[in-house]
Regions:
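Conserved alpha-helical substructure of the radical SAM core
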Residues: 1-69
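Flexible mid-to-C-terminal extensions adjoining Fe-S/redox cofactors in radical SAM and related proteins
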Residues: 209-285
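Conserved, mostly hydrophobic/aromatic
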Residues: 21, 48, 73, 203, ...
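Residues that scaffold the ATP/ADP-binding catalytic core of kinase and kinase-like folds
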Residues: 29, 58, 81-82, 86, ...
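Structural motif
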Residues: 22, 49-51, 113, 274-277
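Alpha-helix N-cap/loop-to-helix initiation residues
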Residues: 28, 56, 92, 118-122, ...
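Radical SAM enzyme [4Fe-4S]-AdoMet core and its adjacent flexible, acidic
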Residues: 66, 74-76, 81-194, 201-202, ...
């Protein structure tokens, strides 16, 4: 916890004010309450990712009383059978819907988080999800399927320009958004390093939760050095109008090749900085 306290203090120097606690399922961590206290909800917005299985009225009130700000509940489909099959857990859909009610009762902010695969944005099921979110006044946050991790080898899941264009069209009509949605008068851009950084349990900093490559370890180096390193990387520093891990096939190949090479040595990810991002060019100074 001392490492997280130092991270919280370092984040203040950068004006970082949000921490999203994810997993696995973070609610299974017996030290979650201590972690929330350490990250300091009086200074930072504490957001919780959950599949909803354990997020009932009691847990929602507990999180709100701890100073929690928002809960993001994952829902893969409005069709209960499809959602439960994907989660490999009968009843998962019902538990997710219960979680939304619990969060609302506790006065928490909410998001419905869902993944878009190719062509889903044109389906009746997706229309039903947008209607549900509108009726319940829940913002719909969408992530594009990435050909990495469990999606590796499933290039057919990756959204095309046609999908992305339709999504942008719907953003103007519904309360739906992605990390690429224009905001505060700025056009949508990839937010690696600039708007998001992922910290794992060992202190490794990844520039995106969908990347398995590290920029450095915050328990061994200052956060400022790691973020500066990321901003100077040719893939991560410059602003891009694409999701680099979801749309840029040159980077996707580089990423997956390095992950495969590292996995031949050890099953433990992420790929260390020296074996991955350090091998790419820097932004010209």
């Amino acid at each position: 916890l001392s490492d997280y306290k130092k991270l919280s203090e370092d984040a203040d120097e950068y004006g970082i004010f949000r921490f999203v606690i994810t997993g696995g399922e973070a609610l299974l961590d017996r030290k979650l309450g201590d972690l929330i206290d350490t990250l300091d909800p009086y200074k930072h917005l504490i957001i919780l990712d959950s599949n909803g299985w354990f997020f009932d009225d009691e847990k929602a009130k507990w999180f709100a009383d701890k100073g929690g700000y928002k809960v993001q509940i994952s829902l893969d489909s409005m069709n209960p059978a499809d959602h439960d099959a994907f989660r490999r857990k009968p009843g998962a859909h019902a538990k997710a819907l219960r979680a939304f009610k619990a969060a609302k009762k506790a006065g928490l902010q909410m998001l419905l988080s869902s993944c878009l695969i190719k062509d889903r944005v044109f389906t009746e099921e997706f229309e039903e999800m947008m209607a549900f979110c509108a009726e319940e006044e829940i913002p719909l946050y969408l992530t594009l399927a990435k050909p990495v991790g469990s999606g590796k080898g499933h290039d057919e899941w990756v959204c095309t320009k046609k999908d992305v264009d339709q999504l942008k069209f719907l953003e103007d009509k519904h309360q739906i958004f992605t990390h690429m949605t224009p905001s505060y008068g700025h056009p949508g851009k990839c937010i690696t390093v600039k708007g998001i950084n992922t910290v794992n349990h060992d202190g490794e900093i990844m520039p995106c939760p969908f990347m398995d490559m590290s920029l450095g370890n915050v328990t061994k180096e200052p956060l400022s050095l790691i973020l500066d390193r990321g901003m100077k990387n040719k893939w991560l520093g410059p602003y891009r109008d694409e999701c680099i891990i979801g749309e840029n096939w040159e980077f996707i190949k580089f990423h997956n090749d390095k992950v495969n090479e590292w996995s031949e040595e050890t099953p433990y990810l992420p790929v260390p900085y020296e074996k991955g991002f350090a091998l790419t060019d820097k932004v010209p100074e």
